[in-house]
Amino acid sequence: MSEVVIICSSSDPASSNIASRLLELAEWDEEGTLRFHRSYCMLCIEGELVGLRNLEDMLDRIGLSPRLIIFASRHISKEAVPWLGGHFTGVVREGSFELSRPAPYALKKLLMALQRHAPSTFRLSAEATHHGPVDLRTPSLFAEIGSCEQHWIDPAAGAAVARAILELESYEAHADETVLLGIGGGHYVQRQTELILSRPVAFGHMFSKYQASMLNVEAIKKAADLSGASGVYLDGKSFRSDERRRLEEIAASLDLNVMGIKEVRSL
């Protein structure tokens, strides 16, 4: 049984780079369009990963019922900074939201592995939840290379992400750690990344300060339930007092413990 499914796209140069490095780093058995290694299955598709719908139905039809789905992908940024990282998927808009199930412990292990394997010129971080797929019931994450063509095809960057992915079989090793939602910070959620890498804590869905005003009680409840979160980290530098109070009141109504950076660092 393949417990971890890796989805790659032939139209994405970073995804193809990661797939090539995975094939080099491990021995894979080929069955049609699928590749198998231990409990991993790698599937390459055509087209964009972010627009996939009903992926689990397609996987079920070919006999795959994974416990974790990993999307190997490029990351695009106007700044063209060399970057490695990962994030969960979902879209939050004013008055509506769609969220897939995140994999908090897998993202933590991915970032810890990338910290060891990343080329020295590449920055590392998680990102706030964004884009699709938005309908996944299986825990999932994106593992990415950024931020331009030069970086997407860099073999060392591809190898770093591939090595990190190959360490995710045992991501439950962190399953006794506290899981929090994260709200605040920029898109690259630097303080949440620091906490993930330094403290016995994992993060489920993370939302930037730019998304915070669109989070209502239903969105936060859904994010917490999907993440298995027992609390909410609120980034202290991100909110006016009235906005922070609104978020604290929502968290209290959902019995979620509100924590700042000092409280999380003390864990």
Curated annotation (Swiss-Prot):
Keywords: Hydrolase, Metal-binding, Zinc. Binds 2 Zn(2+) ions per subunit. It catalyses: a D-aminoacyl-tRNA + H2O = a tRNA + a D-alpha-amino acid + H(+); glycyl-tRNA(Ala) + H2O = tRNA(Ala) + glycine + H(+). Its cofactor is Zn(2+). Its EC number is 3.1.1.96. The keyword ATP-binding does not apply. The keyword Zinc applies. GO terms for molecular function: D-aminoacyl-tRNA deacylase activity; zinc ion binding. It is an enzyme of class 3 (hydrolase). GO terms for biological process: D-amino acid catabolic process. InterPro entries: Deacylase_DtdA_archaea, DtdA. Monomer. D-aminoacyl-tRNA deacylase with broad substrate specificity. By recycling D-aminoacyl-tRNA to D-amino acids and free tRNA molecules, this enzyme counteracts the toxicity associated with the formation of D-aminoacyl-tRNA entities in vivo. Belongs to the DtdA deacylase family. This is D-aminoacyl-tRNA deacylase. It comes from Methanothrix thermoacetophila (strain DSM 6194 / JCM 14653 / NBRC 101360 / PT). The lineage of its organism: Archaea, Methanobacteriati, Methanobacteriota, Stenosarchaea group, Methanomicrobia. The gene is dtdA.
